[in-house]
Amino acid sequence: MDSSLKQKWVRALRSGKYEQATGALRNEDGFCCLGVLCDVYDPDKWVEPIPPLDEDEDDDGKWNYADQGDNYLYDTTDVLPVHITRIAGLTAQNPEVPYGIDGEMKSLASINDNGATFAEIADLIETHL
């Protein structure tokens, strides 16, 4: 992983600036650990959720993150966009690290969504990415 971006990401996760959320890179509650990486890289690329046209439609409140051409795709609300993955020097849009007593490989989003704190995730990133 790009060492400069990694350092900024880890520092941001430990900063207390970000509220932790689950289920999306960013939503009305805050950020997933992967969303923090997007925000560290370029905080101006977030695209606010569009309210549903039909009141029966579910408004999940997920923000999209624009690509390099200021386009956005709905499939980039839960994992890193491809261009952020490449820029960061990661091999996957949802990187895996050894986690738990048995050291089983788990995705960062899964670790985030299952209750690990940003500080704990920062330690994992620092050690394994």
Protein language model features and the residues they cover:
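Domain-length accessory/inserted modules outside core catalytic folds
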Residues: M1-F31, C38-L129
